Amino acid sequence: MCDDGAVCAATAAANADDKSLLARFYHADRSLTAVASELDSFDGRAEPDRCSRLVSRLRQNQDKVLAITNLIMEELLGEDRDPRAFRAKFPEEVLQENLAGQLWFGAECLAAGSSILNRETESKEMRPLAQAVTKSLGNVRVLLRDQCLRNNVPNSKTLHLDFNDCTTEQLYESLKIFDRLFAEFELSYVSAMVQVKSRHEYEMQQWIGVLFSETLQRALKMGLLDQEMVDAFDPGLMFSIPRLAIVAGLVVYNKGPLNMDMPGDQLSEMFRPFRTILIKIRDLLRNLNQQELYQLEKLLCTNEDINTKAPLGSSSIEAPSQQDYSTANTHRTLERLTVDQRNNNNNINNNSSSSSNSNSGAPSVQEDANHRSPSMLSLSTASPTPSHSIGSTFSAATSSTNPPVNWSDGDDADDDDDGDDDDEDDDDDVDDDLVGNDDSDDDDDDTTDEHLLDDIVAADCASGYLIPNTNLGNLLQPQQVTLTDNFVASDDDDGYGQVAAGAGNDEEPSTSAATRHMQRLHLPSSDSYGDADGSHNNTTTIKSPDSDGQQQHQQHTSSRQRHSHHHHRHHHHHHRHSSHSSHSHHHQHQQHHSQPHPHRTTRSGRKRCSLESPTDVDVTVVQPEPEPELVSASADNSTASSLSDDISLAMRNTTARLKFKSTENLLHRLFVCIAGVADQLQTNFASDLRQILRSVFLMNVSSSQEEIDDIPEKTKESELFEFRASENDVIQESAGSNQSIYSAEEVNPELDNVFSASGARHSAGASMQRNHTTIDNNNSTSSSPPDATITTTTTTTTTRSHVTRSRSLGDQEVVASAAAAAAAAVNEEREMQRQRNNSVGSNTPSSASSSATSSSSEQNSPVSMRSGTGRRRHQSNNETQMPTTATTTTTTGTGTLAPPAWIPDGKAPRCMSCQTPFTAFRRRHHCRNCGGVFCGVCSNASAPLPKYGLTKAVRVCRDCYAREIRSSGGGGGGVVQMQRQQAANRPQTASAS
């Protein structure tokens, strides 16, 4: 046994070029053992440089040993291998070819007692598993070395093991154990090193891919993107699709993966860090109408200028009418609210106390009062109508000469008088941004307020309340104002002058802290306010006297004309009204409304307005513990009470956009925020985003493009990818051109006149086919003399160059006389393909015709027997079709062949030599000599290919390498035979020549 083993070992050592799996494992394992022994023979701390070099070599040898072991397990275990579907959850950067070596190195370190940095707990848990992995791998190495000495067959592509031998059975079981342990350790180790997706996260990523795909299809239907961009994989779509997906996921498919109402831990990790800003973006997007949303999406796609120049409010969602009470762009809670437009019209036209009484308790009107439609944002912003002016909540104090609202006790009223005037200059710009004030019309306030009031009241009756939300973050706030949720601003008092002292007598005072709070905010005097602090249980009643009715009527007549021109300036105008005028305006407002206008419900209480009589109006604020008589005054508003929470949320959405001075400003801010989030995905989640976008492109590519990719034999689009100069290879054509070729289209000056005659030089065959352009190879050959730098050219070389060139440009010309020969060639090629898959070489005799410069190595080249999808070459036995002007059969050493076409990766699921399936770790490699697809082991050789113009060493497969090395420059029949065999797959082109 020992003698036989020694003989086998000596034989294996002598045959170092043996390419069988067992022999390769034997030599790789010996090299690894030698490096490990050297590494253990000295103190690494004394010689750190040497230790570092040896560790690098050790890891390389570990990679090699594990790669060969993996091939052996693929062949022996087959379907019994442990599944590794968990790799789909790994980040893309983890899936590398040397991952197995890293895992082995990590297992040895853990087994030796080391720990992963900052992962002490995980290291302790994985240490027993790491010890089991290293022990199992050592056992497998011993058994495989024994099999190398027992059952190795030199240069065998398969394992020849004796399955009746107990050692073979032991090897089989050991491989199964090692495979299971190594897979378990791989998952544990990678999970400890990087973040691995959970099942829920993986499903959420798939849903995000669906969202991206739906977004792309929606953009195509809307005309935002073109199908040509998708088919061409336009890089700009890498940025446009995520941006559009954020918009669509927030407002269009709002129940999908970007549903911000779900808990944060259920969101995808891609969008979880941006949850807060996405909620704010959603709130603003819901207030955009269709035109504004389209402009925003167009801006996100093209970065073009915004065309919307209208004011913010005029371009928002339309007001509810008698037929249509809501629009699709408003919040879903708005859709549940209705507006009694007929009552509103009666209120505007009649101005009667009976109308006011008849509608004072209508629930539908109560709902409308609590929830203003965003269509009238500009009017409500510019309106001094009681309970409706909202801009004051976001701006500081505007210019005002009157004292603020009497929120506190009588002795605090005088203190409030001085607060607004001091800061009016500092805050005018803020107010101008929101409502567009103009100081030029201050002198006309006393004469034009009636008409302004009339139009504003009509608008307010039709659109309800707008209560500001004050919780938005600084990112979406163009104006930095310190606002809280502890107060709700309304316009009942201040819009038409301050409340008179007499009215304050009937008012139960609120706390002085609330008054000081409002003073600090410098809210404009055009607004009236409810309770400043919802935590206090108090009731404020503001009564309007009878004597103010006449003045209201006069002002109502005169304000109509002014409002049409200056409705955006009402805040500034009405800050200078007297307190008596304030009562009159308030009374007139109640006549026009003739229904209650409840305020926004705060955290601690609910505010309502009720009408008691045509002349005496009580604006009642109901807190959690109100007095009984005040509760009875608003008992008929139960419908609005049940919807108060939804209304409060909707009000935040509809009024958030009032912080922006124009629609353009709002859209620009949304663009910045959305683009910022989407671009962050490109950086923080690049791997996941690439996978999602790749799937989206594959799902949405046009059908014609899919056919081109799937059937390259018919369309010859794959010819564009038959050669890639990724190794700095330069192809020199017969004319001496030194251009680098990055596609299938070669540089051939002999056909320049052909392309100039046909119009333009195309890079793809499809474009030539669409233009119905054909190239006559016979004519081009006879009329195009060779370049001056070429001394002689054979008929075969010229014809091959012309036909190959025509083929790469989509020449589909068919000659009927060659149909029979083509059919025979197809059968011959199929037989050759079967032989190629089952054998290494070919003994097919060469053709009688030959070329002097073609090496004899091509006679047995696997090019002639590889798959016909990407390695076919033109048939060269067509001298009878060539003109008599080219009769020589010799060629110079400067003539080169066209590079072989590459087989597409999708057409080669297995290595064409060892038949090993490709995985994420076993990558595909193309042989530059035959175009076949091989694994890294079967294509690890390199050799120059001067016949293709490749003077530097390039990657070739083992078979081609052996033939190139063994070739001695004999007869050239191999080229002709290769061309005949490859022409069988392309009978049309062959016959056309």
Swiss-Prot record:
<feature type="compositionally biased region" description="Polar residues">
    <location>
        <begin position="535"/>
        <end position="549"/>
    </location>
</feature>
<dbReference type="InterPro" id="IPR017455">
    <property type="entry name" value="Znf_FYVE-rel"/>
</dbReference>
<feature type="binding site">
    <location>
        <position position="960"/>
    </location>
    <ligand>
        <name>Zn(2+) 2</name>
    </ligand>
</feature>
<dbReference type="InterPro" id="IPR043269">
    <property type="entry name" value="FYVE_LST2"/>
</dbReference>
<feature type="compositionally biased region" description="Low complexity">
    <location>
        <begin position="884"/>
        <end position="896"/>
    </location>
</feature>
<feature type="binding site">
    <location>
        <position position="930"/>
    </location>
    <ligand>
        <name>Zn(2+) 2</name>
    </ligand>
</feature>
<feature type="binding site">
    <location>
        <position position="935"/>
    </location>
    <ligand>
        <name>Zn(2+) 1</name>
    </ligand>
</feature>
<dbReference type="GO" id="GO:0008270">
    <property type="term" value="F:zinc ion binding"/>
</dbReference>
<protein>
    <recommendedName>
        <fullName>Lateral signaling target protein 2 homolog</fullName>
    </recommendedName>
</protein>
<feature type="binding site">
    <location>
        <position position="957"/>
    </location>
    <ligand>
        <name>Zn(2+) 2</name>
    </ligand>
</feature>
<dbReference type="Pfam" id="PF01363">
    <property type="entry name" value="FYVE"/>
</dbReference>
<keyword id="KW-0862">Zinc</keyword>
<feature type="binding site">
    <location>
        <position position="914"/>
    </location>
    <ligand>
        <name>Zn(2+) 1</name>
    </ligand>
</feature>
<feature type="modified residue" description="Phosphoserine">
    <location>
        <position position="525"/>
    </location>
</feature>
<feature type="region of interest" description="Disordered">
    <location>
        <begin position="825"/>
        <end position="902"/>
    </location>
</feature>
<feature type="compositionally biased region" description="Acidic residues">
    <location>
        <begin position="409"/>
        <end position="448"/>
    </location>
</feature>
<keyword id="KW-0863">Zinc-finger</keyword>
<keyword id="KW-0479">Metal-binding</keyword>
<feature type="modified residue" description="Phosphoserine">
    <location>
        <position position="808"/>
    </location>
</feature>
<dbReference type="InterPro" id="IPR000306">
    <property type="entry name" value="Znf_FYVE"/>
</dbReference>
<feature type="compositionally biased region" description="Polar residues">
    <location>
        <begin position="978"/>
        <end position="993"/>
    </location>
</feature>
<feature type="binding site">
    <location>
        <position position="938"/>
    </location>
    <ligand>
        <name>Zn(2+) 1</name>
    </ligand>
</feature>
<keyword id="KW-0597">Phosphoprotein</keyword>
<feature type="modified residue" description="Phosphoserine">
    <location>
        <position position="526"/>
    </location>
</feature>
<feature type="region of interest" description="Disordered">
    <location>
        <begin position="759"/>
        <end position="813"/>
    </location>
</feature>
<feature type="region of interest" description="Disordered">
    <location>
        <begin position="340"/>
        <end position="449"/>
    </location>
</feature>
<dbReference type="GO" id="GO:0031901">
    <property type="term" value="C:early endosome membrane"/>
</dbReference>
<dbReference type="InterPro" id="IPR051118">
    <property type="entry name" value="LST-2"/>
</dbReference>
<feature type="binding site">
    <location>
        <position position="911"/>
    </location>
    <ligand>
        <name>Zn(2+) 1</name>
    </ligand>
</feature>
<feature type="zinc finger region" description="FYVE-type">
    <location>
        <begin position="905"/>
        <end position="965"/>
    </location>
</feature>
<dbReference type="InterPro" id="IPR013083">
    <property type="entry name" value="Znf_RING/FYVE/PHD"/>
</dbReference>
<feature type="compositionally biased region" description="Basic residues">
    <location>
        <begin position="559"/>
        <end position="608"/>
    </location>
</feature>
<feature type="binding site">
    <location>
        <position position="927"/>
    </location>
    <ligand>
        <name>Zn(2+) 2</name>
    </ligand>
</feature>
<feature type="compositionally biased region" description="Polar residues">
    <location>
        <begin position="372"/>
        <end position="405"/>
    </location>
</feature>
<feature type="compositionally biased region" description="Low complexity">
    <location>
        <begin position="842"/>
        <end position="862"/>
    </location>
</feature>
<comment type="similarity">
    <text>Belongs to the lst-2 family.</text>
</comment>
<comment type="function">
    <text>Negative regulator of epidermal growth factor receptor (EGFR) signaling.</text>
</comment>
<feature type="region of interest" description="Disordered">
    <location>
        <begin position="968"/>
        <end position="993"/>
    </location>
</feature>
<feature type="region of interest" description="Disordered">
    <location>
        <begin position="494"/>
        <end position="623"/>
    </location>
</feature>
<feature type="compositionally biased region" description="Low complexity">
    <location>
        <begin position="343"/>
        <end position="360"/>
    </location>
</feature>
<dbReference type="InterPro" id="IPR011011">
    <property type="entry name" value="Znf_FYVE_PHD"/>
</dbReference>
<feature type="compositionally biased region" description="Low complexity">
    <location>
        <begin position="759"/>
        <end position="801"/>
    </location>
</feature>
